[in-house]
Amino acid sequence: MEDKPLVVSKQKTEVVCGVPTQVVCTAFSSHILVVVTQFGKMGTLVSLEPSNVANDISKPVLTTRVLLGQDEPLIHVFAKNLVAFVSQEAGNRAVLLAMAVKDKSMERLKALKEVIRLCQVW
């Protein structure tokens, strides 16, 4: 029998919009942990849980909940746009996102998504 590690993790450091950025993705059995930092700390911790909509089971809606840090509407929108693809590609698993970024612009969002793709563990 092949020994598969219980936890799979990948890490990448890239310059995003002129700022050194570290991304770490770790796959657990039921969750994917994504850490995105430009400050060397975890920052705001957001849980993204898929929940099925009654009329369309194929496209679950992600429910966001801030567990630690600023609970502002922009945090929810940014988190959902940043890692929704992770949940979908991982078979609708829950995602735990820790993020500490300088700003939440659309340009930075797109660049961060590409770095997250480089750390694919799902």
From Swiss-Prot:
Q: InterPro entries attached here?
A: Proteasome_assmbl_chp_3 (IPR018788), Psm_Assembly_Chaperone (IPR053720)
Gene Ontology CC annotations of this record: cytosol; protein-containing complex
Quote the protein name from its UniProt record.
Proteasome assembly chaperone 3
Instruction: Give the coiled coil ranges.
Output: none
Where in the sequence is N-acetylmethionine found?
1
Keyword Chaperone attributed: yes
The UniProt function text for this chain reads:
Chaperone protein which promotes assembly of the 20S proteasome. May cooperate with PSMG1-PSMG2 heterodimers to orchestrate the correct assembly of proteasomes.
Q: Name one Pfam family in it.
A: PAC3
Oligomeric and partner information: Homodimer. Interacts directly with alpha and beta subunits of the 20S proteasome but dissociates before the formation of half-proteasomes, probably upon recruitment of POMP. Interacts with PSMG4.
Q: Which GO terms describe its biological process?
A: chaperone-mediated protein complex assembly; proteasome assembly
A single Gene Ontology MF term assigned here is: molecular adaptor activity
Q: Which domain of life is it from?
A: Eukaryota
List the keywords (alphabetical).
Answer: Acetylation, Chaperone
Q: Which family does it belong to?
A: Belongs to the PSMG3 family.
Cleaved signal peptide residues: none
